[in-house]
Amino acid sequence: MDTMITTPLILILITCGANSQTVKPDTASESDQPTWSNPLFTYPEGCTLDKLSKVNASQLRCPRIFDDENRGLIAYPTSIRSLSVGNDLGEIHTQGNHIHKVLYRTICSTGFFGGQTIEKALVEMKLSTKEAGAYDTTTAAALYFPAPRCQWYTDNVQNDLIFYYTTQKSVLRDPYTRDFLDSDFIGGKCTKSPCQTHWSNVVWMGDAGIPACDSSQEIKAHLFVDKISNRVVKATSYGHHPWGLHRACMIEFCGKQWIRTDLGDLISVEYNSGAEILSFPKCEDKTMGMRGNLDDFAYLDDLVKASESREECLEAHAEIISTNSVTPYLLSKFRSPHPGINDVYAMHKGSIYHGMCMTVAVDEVSKDRTTYRAHRATSFTKWERPFGDEWEGFHGLHGNNTTIIPDLEKYVAQYKTSMMEPMSIKSVPHPSILAFYNETDLSGISIRKLDSFDLQSLHWSFWPTISALGGIPLVLLLAVAACCCWSGRPPTPSAPQSIPMYHLANRS
C-alpha cells in the first residue's frame, strides 16, 4: 500500500569527536512509522478534546511539503557526500566499452541462366565474458560484409566474417558495493568486469571506477536530535529534502559502524569529547547500495503530488476565509500526508478545533469504514471522535452508521454530499468569557487589555460616583461663601433716570 520514495545513495560524514556516554534514542512511538511514504490515509491517535483549541479560519495552516522546522532539536554540523546534490556526476561514472561479437554474412543464390540474388545478414554470435578479452577488437567504422561467393545453379551460398568490435559505454558505479549499475546488465547490476548483458553477443568491459567509501565530494549539512528523547530525527542540507531517520539502524561497512537511514543512506559520526553517542538497533538485513535510476523520477512524482495537494489546500483555505464557512471536504485538505506529530483539525457546532497530535499511517480501512488498521498493527481500531458523539471526527471524517472519509469518498462515483454541507464559523471568544458565560450568551461581551488608555478611561468612569458623593456639600459651601461676600459690600447709589434740559441751559 505504501509507496516508498527513494533517492540516490549518499554518504554523510559528521564531524563531532570521541569519549562519551551512550544514549539510546527513544524510537517506540515514531520509529515504526514510514517517514517518506504516502499512505492511503493518516489519522490522529490519542488526540482528546483537552488537546484541542478553537481557532479562527485565518489560523488554519496547510501541511508543509516537508517538515523543515527544527524546534526542540539539537543540530549536529555535518559534511555530506551526496550523489543527488552535486551537479557533477562524472565522478560516479565508470568509462567502459561494449564488446560485440557479430557475424557478417553475404548470401548468394545463382540460377540456371546465371541470374544472381545477393543478401546480407548480421548474426549474433554468443560471447562469453572469458572470451571477450581474448581477441583483438576493431572499431565499428572498419566493419564490412565479405564479397559474395557464388556457384552456378546453387542457392544460399554463404560467405562469413566474424568481427569483435567495441562501442563506448559508461555506467554508474556504486560507491559502497562497487557494483556496476546499468539497465543493460542482467538484473541491472554486475559485480565484476567483464559483465554479461541482456544480449548474448555483447559483453561490457570497464575500468575499476571510483573506490569504495570515497568521500571526495562533500557539502555542508546538519543532523537533528530531539532534546528530550535523544532521538535522531533527520538530516538536512540546503536545497535538498530532509533524509528521514525514524527507522535508522546500525550497519557495518568499510570496517566501521554506520547509521543507515530510512532510504538506505549511510551516516558516519565522529564525536567530540563529551558528546552523547547515539545508539541504534542493528539492521536486520545487510542491504546497501544505490537505488535504480528510476527512483529519482519516483521522488519527483511524489514531490509533484505533494505540491498539488498543498495548492488544493491553499485554495480550500481561501474559500473558507472568504465564505466564513467550512465543509468536511474542505477541512480534509489540511490533513498531513505523512505520519508523525502534525497539525490536526476538526469541526464541531460552528467552531474549528486545532491541536498538535500524533498521526499514524492507515494501512487498511474496513469495508463499512467504521474501523481501520494502523501501520504494523494487527487489529482494527475505531476512529477517534473527540467530541463524545458518533458523528464528527478529524479532517472531515463524519457519519453515524456509515463513516464518510472525504479523502476516500472523492474517488467514489456516487459520493455522499454530506461532505459538501457548509458549517458557518463562529468567532473564537476570549477564554475568560467562557469561564462565566455559556456560548449562547456571548453577544455584546468583549475583553480589552488594561493599558494606559484604559486606566484613564477607568478614572473617568468613576467621576460620576465621586460627583455624587461630594457634589452636594461643595455646592452648599459655595453658596455660603457667596452670601458672606455679598453682605459686606457698601450700598451703591442709584443713578438718575434722566437729566432735565433746563439744567444745561442755566450753566450757559
UniProtKB/Swiss-Prot annotation:
Q: What is this protein called?
A: Glycoprotein
Q: Which family does it belong to?
A: Belongs to the novirhabdovirus glycoprotein family.
Glycan attachment positions:
56, 400-401, 438
Localization in the cell: Virion membrane
Biological process annotations from GO = symbiont entry into host cell; virion attachment to host cell
**Region forming the signal peptide:** 1-20
GO CC terms of this entry: membrane; viral envelope; virion membrane
Role played: Binds to specific receptor at cellular surface, bringing about the attachment of the virus particle to the cell. Plays a major role in the determination of host range restriction and virulence. Class I viral fusion protein. Responsible for penetration of the viral nucleocapsid into the cell cytoplasm by mediating the fusion of the membrane of the endocytosed virus particle with the endosomal membrane. Low pH in endosomes induce an irreversible conformational change in G, releasing a fusion hydrophobic peptide.
- Side of membrane Virion surface, spans: 21-461
What binding partners and quaternary form does the record give?
Homotrimer.
Topology versus the membrane, per the UniProt entry?
Single-pass type I membrane protein
Entry keywords, A to Z: Glycoprotein, Host-virus interaction, Membrane, Signal, Transmembrane, Transmembrane helix, Viral attachment to host cell, Viral envelope protein, Virion, Virus entry into host cell
List the Intravirion topological domains: 483-508
Q: Where are the transmembrane segments?
A: 462-482
